[in-house]
Regions:
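N-terminal amphipathic alpha-helix/helix-capping segment at the start of soluble metabolic enzymes
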Residues: 35-87, 204-210, 346-409, 641, ...
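Thr-biased low-complexity repeat/linker tracts and other Thr-enriched repetitive architectures
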Residues: 683-714
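Conserved, mostly hydrophobic/aromatic
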Residues: 85, 146, 216, 259, ...
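N-terminal glycine-rich anion-binding loops that anchor highly charged ligand groups
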Residues: 70-87, 91-110, 114, 119-122, ...
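N-terminal chloroplast transit peptides
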Residues: 1-24
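C-terminal accessory/binding modules appended to enzymatic or scaffolding proteins
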Residues: 385-413, 421, 631-676
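Catalytic alpha/beta core domains of metabolic enzymes, predominantly
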Residues: 182-200, 226-389, 473-478, 484-488, ...
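Active-site beta->alpha loop and helix N-cap motifs at the rims of alpha/beta catalytic domains
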Residues: 58-64, 93-96, 107, 111-244, ...
Length: 743
């Protein structure tokens, strides 16, 4: 059957709510359409060779971007120093004793710098006592004042703290109203700079006089109305917003500052930092970067999103300080911070990389997901091979012979539903499995378990040698590229399909011949000591030049005993660092002795964090700070218990309104602390419930109040009803009943 492909790439500019993902294309003329393919958007954009702008020292190896040194008390930040670790307190800043105790706990856990929210004069006065007490207790850890809306407060606290963080989105413009403001005349837009300079200059001069540092920290969700009107909530707007303030600093010969470009969406975050670095190269600037994914959430999901954003930038040599923002106690942020920093430093010190090549695949200004071809059904197939891959991103699981000894347990670990003991694919079921060894033909029970998986679309992949030793009907053979080329590019006898195993060290000539191989997918598994990010970029570029559209899954392996956080951090940094560029169609994580269910959920977490495939409710929850108006961890867990079964729905849980409404750009619904003792509920950025006391809640549709006085103890129920009213609710599935398996 002749195969043809409609288009070779799709592009989307990242901005608010950018959820368009382009990937697999249906094959024209295929006898049977690929699953879910009819709904795919056809975007006809020609492939072009890209002149990749310089945003890092090298796209072929990890080399630290050279920066000046910024002094923050006793801590030096910049490329000549190790990556500094940061966190932020969650106590009420006015509670001096509690804040001092938490700062000490964070410093003892490894924090180099600690940020404290300072929202008013009372908090600023408390900061004097906090700094004084910490010095008395022998702690000289630098403190950073987190300032929003209050230039006068920033002037006060600069007397006490070593660094001031200002948000360009609200420092001079005041509190956000999300009103649309149109500047038809560019001169009018430029005239507003004078107001910014008038408000900001006194702080610049004071920091310069006292030797204080500053972070110009743009947040994707809290850009000023003026910037939004001109640039939209785009990475370009984020960078321009920061540069307006940096220009004022430079005008007064003040250079002791760093930049940050935070967003809750890792793709937006990565693009913004790359653009920031690119523009600094163009201007000849060398200011350090503080990295962070804001509102990352908690647990494994929060660590994964942070690793995707922070880790991918560290692999390009970007980043001088980092913070992993988790909805957990701040000292728990230190472990993932250390793991990420160590990963970046190792990549730099060991010179991870590949020989230079001409890169034509990536575009750092837009998100472009590489297009692959889904498997097609063939005449005579006894099994349906279309579900072998998933159009939004594929997850494979590595299964051992020992796993087959308990079939029902295996089915559950693969995420399958059980009906009368029989497996059926669910929304988060592994798409296919990989086995290094196959059961002998005499092992009827194990082979029956595999057959049941095959019959519901969970296909079995195995090395060609293993398949030759123990033939399995319908199995997919795995061969190296060299083996496949030597075999004429066809699947070996006894195999229904062929999968390629790549390791990133293949020659240019071998990769140029990949199109001649009739394979349904390739597994890319780089060996130890080889940079996965850089070698994979080379492979994808070579595959593109060869004219092949073979889907590629990242196969990452870990040694026995690897800590779970290490699995998450490295997977997010190495594989997520490729998926944010659209390079890859899924993942398989293999770790000897590790729980299969953990590896599967981590793989799906990787795809969801990379904005590819949603299999569970997405939570955008802030890490809490002194502004937080309720117990974030407790409330987030309450909401998760009631809404965690809604794949495709994103819910923001924000402690206050500083960034809350804005950072909900990617969320469908929001639960935000509006004032002490009050909660606001949102649909998108539209308030639908506002001013709800802790013992009551108000409801809004658009920006119009429609209900007031809902008791706090029913706040989660009000959120559930809001989801139902907007047609996004589904009932919880019935629990499985244990049933005997038919022989």
């Amino acid at each position: 059957m002749q195969r043809s492909v409609a288009s070779s790439r799709g592009q989307a500019q990242l901005g608010a709510g950018s959820r368009q993902l382009y990937g697999f294309r249906q094959i024209k003329g295929a006898r049977l359409a690929a699953p879910m393919q009819a709904a795919a958007t056809e975007l006809m954009i020609p492939t072009i060779d890209l002149d990749l702008p310089k945003y890092c020292e090298s796209v072929h190896q990890t080399r630290r971007r050279p920066t000046r040194t910024v002094t923050i008390g006793p801590v030096k930040v910049g490329s000549q120093h190790r990556v500094a670790l940061q966190t932020m307190t969650t106590t009420d800043t006015r509670d001096v004793a509690a804040t001092v105790a938490q700062v000490k706990k964070c410093a003892d856990a490894g924090a180099d710098i600690v940020r404290i929210t300072v929202q008013g004069r009372k908090e600023a006065e408390a900061c004097m006592k906090i700094r004084e007490q910490l010095f008395k207790d022998g702690y000289d850890v630098p403190l950073v004042a987190d300032i929003h809306f209050q230039p006068a407060v920033a002037m006060m606290v600069a007397e006490a703290f070593e660094k001031i963080r200002i948000n360009p989105g609200n420092f001079a413009d005041g509190r956000k109203t999300f009103e649309e403001i149109n500047y038809d005349d560019p001169a009018e837009f430029e005239a507003e700079r004078a107001h910014i300079e008038e408000v900001f200059t006194p702080l610049v001069l004071k920091c310069k006089e006292l030797g204080r540092a500053m972070r110009i920290g743009t947040n994707h969700g809290s850009l000023s109305a003026r910037i939004l009107s001109f640039y939209g909530d785009t990475p370009k707007g984020m960078v321009e917003s920061a540069f307006e303030f940096a220009d004022i600093c430079r005008k007064h010969d003040y250079h002791n500052f760093v930049f940050s470009m935070k967003a809750s969406n890792p793709l937006v975050m990565v693009q913004a930092y790359r653009l920031l670095a690119e523009e600094q190269y163009k201007r000849g600037w060398d200011y350090p970067l503080h990295l962070g994914v804001t509102e990352a959430g908690e647990g494994e999901d929060g660590r994964m999103k942070s690793a995707i954003g922070i880790g991918s930038l560290l692999m390009d040599g970007l980043g001088d300080t980092i913070r992993v923002s988790l909805t957990e106690d701040p000292e728990y942020e230190m472990d993932p911070c250390k793991r990420l920093a160590s990963l970046g430093e190792t990549a730099c010190s060991e010179g991870w990389g590949v020989p230079e090549f001409s890169e034509t695949t990536r575009d750092t200004h837009t998100f472009s997901r590489r297009v692959g071809v889904l498997p097609e059904q063939r005449e005579g197939d006894e099994l349906d091979f279309r579900p072998l891959l998933h159009r939004d991103g594929t997850v494979f699981s590595a299964v051992s012979l020992a796993d087959l000894k308990q079939p029902e347990a295996l089915y559950r670990k693969l995420g399958a539903k059980l009906v009368v003991g029989m497996p059926f694919k669910d929304i988060a079921t592994s798409d296919s499995i990989f086995m290094r060894q196959l059961p002998a033909e005499s092992d009827a029970e194990a082979r029956r378990a595999l057959r049941r998986l095959q019959e519901v679309g969970v296909h079995v992949l195995a090395p060609a040698a293993a398949l030759a030793a123990n033939p399995l009907p319908g199995a997919v053979a795995v061969m190296t590229l060299a083996e496949a080329l030597a075999a004429g590019g066809k699947a070996p006898a006894g195999a229904s399909r062929l999968t390629l195993s790549l390791n990133g060290t293949e020659s240019d000539d071998q990769l140029a011949a990949i199109k001649s191989v009739d394979a349904v997918v390739a597994l890319l598994d780089t060996p130890d000591g080889v940079s996965r990010v850089h070698s994979s970029r080379r492979v994808f570029d070579a595959i593109k030049r060869a004219g092949s559209e073979i889907p590629v899954l990242h196969h990452i392996r870990f040694a026995a005993g690897t800590h779970r956080d290490e699995v998450v951090i490295k997977t997010g940094s190495w594989v997520g660092g490729l998926l944010v560029d659209g390079l890859g169609d899924g993942a398989m994580i293999e770790a000897e002795g590790e729980d299969l269910d953990f590896l599967r959920t981590t793989s799906f977490g990787l795809l969801q964090g990379s904005r590819m495939r949603n299999v569970k409710t997405e939570y955008v929850s802030c890490p809490s700070c002194g502004r937080t108006l309720f117990d974030l961890q407790e409330v987030t867990e309450q909401i998760r218990q009631k809404t965690g079964h809604l794949p495709g729905v994103a819910i923001a849980v924000m402690g206050c309104i500083v960034n809350g409404p804005g950072e909900m750009a990617d969320a469908d619904f929001g639960y935000v602390g509006g004032a002490p003792g009050k909660i606001d509920l949102y649909v998108g950025k539209e308030v639908v419930q506002r001013g709800i006391p802790m013992d009551s809640i108000d409801l809004y549709v658009g920006k119009e109040v429609v209900q007031r006085g809902i008791p706090m103890d029913s706040a989660c129920d009000a959120l559930v009803q809001l989801i139902k009213d907007n047609g996004r609710w589904v009932d919880l599935p019935e629990p499985e009943e244990a049933q005997p398996v038919a022989a």
